[in-house]
Amino acid sequence: MSAVEWSILPGLSPYRETLEAMENRVAAIRAGEAAEAIWLLEHPPLYTAGTSARPEDLVEPERFPVHVAGRGGQYTYHGPGQRVAYVMLDLDRRGRDVRRFVTALEDWVIATLAEFNVRGERREGRVGVWVVRPDRPAGLDGSPREDKIAAIGVKLRRWVSFHGLSINVEPNLTHFEGIVPCGIREHGVTSLVDLGLPVTMQDLDAALLRTFPQHFPD
């Protein structure tokens, strides 16, 4: 099976049930019983802890439910207005190179943002995608402010990927204040709407679909 099956889930998907369904799909892909898949969805407000999460980075543990995700990375927030893309691809077929896979995810996000004339950038030592904010006050050292617009955290099981990425369309950015996102204190978070772009979830989904084959060819 080579065609990637796309699903756009309506409403807010409960985290635990979605994680269980994702694990079942990964097992089916590994067994050759199901096609690779990408699920586009939103979660209710919650925090997830990756395998590198530090307790001190959970600033407000009572604010929202906290889930141990099992993916790489640290703490992140999911909630309404944020598009989560769960990416279940067979790297045994596509190439057993985890770093290349994460780079391809970043490139996919960067290409998607470019569809809206947003320049997303990667930073050494900071997984995810960032935007420079010349409209905001510079840092204490005079460097321009940079805000995170997309987070990436993945896990592999027998070379099938799961978890994936999240892109901020129009979430409540104050909800990120309950954590230190991805363990990075010196930078903020932003969204497409925060950047002044009236982008809808449907607009973003269409851009994700258009740009995907450039970075993950069959």
UniProtKB/Swiss-Prot annotation:
Pathway: Protein modification; protein lipoylation via endogenous pathway; protein N(6)-(lipoyl)lysine from octanoyl-[acyl-carrier-protein]: step 1/2. It comes from the Bacteria. Its main location: cytoplasm. PROSITE patterns: BPL_LPL_CATALYTIC, LIPB. It is an enzyme of class 2 (transferase). Its EC number is 2.3.1.181. Keywords: Acyltransferase, Cytoplasm, Transferase. One of its GO terms (biological process) is protein modification process. The active site is at C182. It catalyses: octanoyl-[ACP] + L-lysyl-[protein] = N(6)-octanoyl-L-lysyl-[protein] + holo-[ACP] + H(+). The record marks K148 as: Lowers pKa of active site Cys. Substrate binds at R71, G72, G73, Q74, Y75, T76, Y77, H78, A151, I152, G153, G164, L165, S166. It is found in: Cytoplasm. Residues 32-218 form the BPL/LPL catalytic domain. Pfam families: LplA-B_cat. One of its GO terms (cellular component) is cytoplasm. GO terms for molecular function: lipoyl(octanoyl) transferase activity. Belongs to the LipB family. Catalyzes the transfer of endogenously produced octanoic acid from octanoyl-acyl-carrier-protein onto the lipoyl domains of lipoate-dependent enzymes. Lipoyl-ACP can also act as a substrate although octanoyl-ACP is likely to be the physiological substrate. In the reaction, the free carboxyl group of octanoic acid is attached via an amide linkage to the epsilon-amino group of a specific lysine residue of lipoyl domains of lipoate-dependent enzymes. This is Octanoyltransferase. It comes from Cereibacter sphaeroides (strain ATCC 17023 / DSM 158 / JCM 6121 / CCUG 31486 / LMG 2827 / NBRC 12203 / NCIMB 8253 / ATH 2.4.1.) (Rhodobacter sphaeroides). The gene is lipB.
